[in-house]
C-alpha cells in the first residue's frame, strides 16, 4: 500500500502525509505523541474518513480484506460464538466449527462459547474482539491501541497471535501504540508522526534506538522520564 500527498483538515488539525510506503506482509508501527494523526490516518485507510486530497493505493485490496481492532471492543449483544462468526456471516462464509473452537481455545474462551459477550471481563472482551478480526483471514489489520489496557500476559498473547499469523499467511499489520517495548519487539518498520506529518520511517532500531531526528529524540526522552515516574510511584506504594 502506498500513500501519496494525503491531506485531511479536521478543525485546527491538518494531516499531511507526503509519502508513506506500507509494504505488504510486514508489521508496521505508527508512533508519535497524542494528537499527531495516527488514528486519523487509520480511519482514512479504512475508508471511515475521506481525504481532502491525495491518494491511497490499496494495490488490489478491497474493503472486505481490511479490518480493525481498537482500544474499546465493539461487540454484538449476543453470544461469544455469534460475535466470533459475525465477520464470516456477513461475507457469506460457512463457519468451520473446529476452527472456531481453535480460536476460542487459544484465548481461553472455549468454555464461554455460548455465554453472552457482555458477561466477559474487559480483557476477555478484548481477546474476543481481536480474534474476531482475524478469523476471516484478512489481508490488512489495523490495531489501534488495542494493547493499551491489557495485562502483561494478555499483551504477550496478542503479540504471539500476530507473529503466528504473520508466519501462516502474509498479513499486513498497522499497529498504533504508545508501548514502545511492543513496537520494538514486534514491528518490522516504524513510521513516526509529528503534527500530522511523517517525519521518519525505518526499522525499530533506526527510529527508536538510534534516532537522528531531534523531535524523535525529545519524544523518547520524555517517554523515558514518564516511565521512570511511574516506576517511582509504584516503588513508593510498595
Predicted regions located by residue number:
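Conserved ABC ATPase signature
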Residues: 116-120
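The feature captures the beta-strand-to-loop junction immediately N-terminal to the Walker
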Residues: 31-33
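Conserved ABC ATPase "signature" region
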Residues: 97-112
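Helix-to-loop junction immediately C-terminal to a conserved catalytic motif
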Residues: 46
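H-loop/switch region of ABC-family ATPase nucleotide-binding domains
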Residues: 177-178
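A short, surface-exposed alpha-helical micro-motif characterized by mixed small hydrophobic
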Residues: 183-185
Amino acid at each position: 500500500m502506498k500513500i501519496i500527498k494525503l491531506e485531511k483538515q479536521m478543525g485546527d488539525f491538518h494531516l499531511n502525509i507526503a509519502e508513506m510506503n506500507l509494504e505488504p506482509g510486514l508489521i508496521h508501527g505508527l508512533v508519535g505523541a497524542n494528537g499527531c494523526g495516527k488514528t486519523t490516518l487509520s480511519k482514512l485507510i479504512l475508508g471511515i474518513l475521506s481525504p481532502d486530497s491525495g491518494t491511497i493505493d490499496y494495490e488490489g485490496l478491497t474493503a472486505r480484506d481490511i479490518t480493525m481492532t481498537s482500544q474499546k471492543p465493539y461487540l454484538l449483544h449476543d453470544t461469544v460464538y455469534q460475535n466470533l462468526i459475525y465477520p464470516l456471516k456477513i461475507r457469506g462464509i460457512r463457519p468451520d466449527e473446529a476452527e472456531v473452537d481453535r480460536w476460542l481455545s487459544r484465548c481461553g474462551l472455549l468454555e464461554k462459547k455460548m455465554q453472552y459477550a457482555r458477561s466477559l471481563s474487559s480483557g476477555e472482551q478484548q481477546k474476543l474482539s481481536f480474534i474476531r478480526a482475524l478469523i476471516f483471514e484478512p489481508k490488512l489489520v489495523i490495531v489501534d491501541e488495542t494493547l493499551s489496557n491489557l495485562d502483561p500476559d494478555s499483551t504477550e498473547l496478542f503479540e504471539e497471535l500476530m507473529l503466528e499469523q504473520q508466519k501462516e499467511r502474509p498479513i499486513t499489520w498497522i499497529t498504533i501504540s504508545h508501548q514502545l517495548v511492543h513496537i520494538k519487539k514486534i514491528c518490522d518498520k516504524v513510521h513516526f508522526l509529528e503534527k500530522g506529518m511523517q517525519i521518519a520511517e525505518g526499522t525499530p532500531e533506526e527510529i527508536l534506538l538510534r534516532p537522528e531526528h531531534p523531535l524523535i529524540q525529545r519524544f523518547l526522552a520524555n517517554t523515558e522520564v514518564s516511565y521512570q515516574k511511574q516506576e517511582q510511584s509504584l516503588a513508593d506504594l510498595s
